[in-house]
Swiss-Prot record:
GO cellular component, one term: plasma membrane-derived thylakoid membrane
Residues passing through the membrane, by range: 36-56, 95-115, 131-151
Gene name in the database record: petD
GO BP term, pick one: photosynthetic electron transport chain
Function recorded in the entry: Component of the cytochrome b6-f complex, which mediates electron transfer between photosystem II (PSII) and photosystem I (PSI), cyclic electron flow around PSI, and state transitions.
Identification of the protein by name: Cytochrome b6-f complex subunit 4
Top-level taxon of origin: Bacteria
Pfam family, one: Cytochrom_B_C
Description of how the protein assembles with itself and partners: The 4 large subunits of the cytochrome b6-f complex are cytochrome b6, subunit IV (17 kDa polypeptide, PetD), cytochrome f and the Rieske protein, while the 4 small subunits are PetG, PetL, PetM and PetN. The complex functions as a dimer.
Length: 160
């Protein structure tokens, strides 16, 4: 069964619509040029209008205004470097901190050799890779949250 609707070209109403350039969405005309040239720009401009409207109506501020005469107590890196910053901050020896960070790519490189499974198999049936992924995700979130706290509360996240 075809998913396209076949046009009845003997219908005079359809012929009148087609002569005016109407009716192309009813019988399965390809997306080019009608949808790509007319519908997509309308959706793109509508999305841009929504984003600009929301930005004008409710601007999001990045934080406190910069004051060059007041240095914060602890200078934090960008948010995506929080876990790395936490490792370097907590480990007493900086060389050990760098060595711990080199273990991350080495561990990722070793996963295919540890778990020899067909690459087309279901990823949820790969227990070693799933365990690495879940442990790494939990550790990254834990280290990222800990980096935002003072050093004495960073390992316990202030819970204990």
């Amino acid at each position: 069964m075809s998913t396209l609707k076949k046009p009845n070209l003997s219908d005079p109403k359809l012929r009148a619509k087609l002569s005016k350039g109407m009716g192309h969405n009813y019988y399965g005309e390809p997306a080019w040029p009608n949808d790509l040239l007319y519908i997509f720009p309308v959706v793109i401009l509508g999305t841009i209008a929504c984003v600009v409207g929301l930005a004008v109506l409710d601007p999001a501020f990045l934080g406190d205004k910069a004051n060059p005469f007041a240095t914060p107590l602890e200078i934090l890196p960008e948010w995506y470097l929080y876990p790395v910053f936490q490792i370097l901050r907590v480990v007493p020896n900086k060389l050990l901190g760098i060595a711990l960070q080199t273990l991350i790519p080495l561990g990722l490189i070793l996963i295919p050799f540890i778990e020899n499974v067909n690459k087309f198999s279901n990823p949820f049936r790969r227990p070693v890779a799933m365990a690495f992924f879940l442990f790494g995700t939990a550790l990254t979130i834990y280290l990222g949250i800990g980096a935002c706290l003072p050093i004495d509360k960073s390992l316990t996240l202030g819970l204990f």
